[in-house]
């Protein structure tokens, strides 16, 4: 396996599109899914274009499980990690703020720690969100716009965004965030 990428949240819209792109470029893609998702789950339909590819490996894993994430990274030795996993329903984040913060913030810190402790040369991408801007009406919005999240989802993603920045500067890691807009 020459070019290996780990894509968390591979059954989501962005994860499945990214998997298709990477496979078309000759990568082996290791995708993680929550342990509660079975292969006949509706979300696997997003991967229909590549589900039978010999270059796609699916692993069941909780982003907050350090041991499981460490095992996957040490087993497949990816050089690139794309974290697209999240509890992404803003409305749901008001109903389940603890679970949202655990997945969307602590899960990211966990992944950063696994990368730092296993292979600090891994290039890591964190999917941030326009929800970090919250009720800020400035247009256009970019990384210099004031953050003002109003939902548990936005707050957790902002904390993760800042953790990526902290790890990049504190540990000299290649860790980058991209702010996604829908």
What are the residue ranges of the model-derived segments?
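N-terminal Rossmann-like NAD(P)+-binding domain of SDR-like oxidoreductases, especially those catalyzing
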Residues: 1-181
């Amino acid at each position: 396996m020459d070019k290996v990428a780990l894509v968390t949240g591979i059954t989501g819209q962005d994860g499945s599109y990214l998997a298709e792109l990477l496979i078309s470029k000759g990568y082996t893609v290791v995708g993680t899914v929550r342990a509660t998702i079975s292969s006949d789950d509706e979300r696997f339909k997003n991967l229909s274009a590549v589900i039978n590819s010999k270059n796609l490996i699916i692993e069941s894993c909780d982003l907050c499980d350090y041991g499981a994430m460490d095992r996957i990274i040490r087993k497949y030795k990816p050089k690139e990690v794309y974290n697209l996993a999240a509890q992404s329903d803003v409305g749901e984040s008001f109903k389940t703020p603890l679970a949202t913060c655990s997945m969307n913030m602590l899960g990211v810190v966990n992944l950063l720690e696994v990368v730092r402790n296993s292979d600090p040369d891994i290039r890591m991408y964190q999917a941030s969100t326009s929800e970090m801007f919250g009720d800020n009406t400035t247009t256009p919005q970019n990384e210099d716009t004031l953050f003002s999240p109003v939902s548990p989802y936005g707050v957790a993603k902002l904390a993760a965004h800042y953790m990526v920045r902290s790890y990049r500067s504190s540990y000299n890691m290649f860790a980058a965030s991209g702010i996604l807009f829908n």
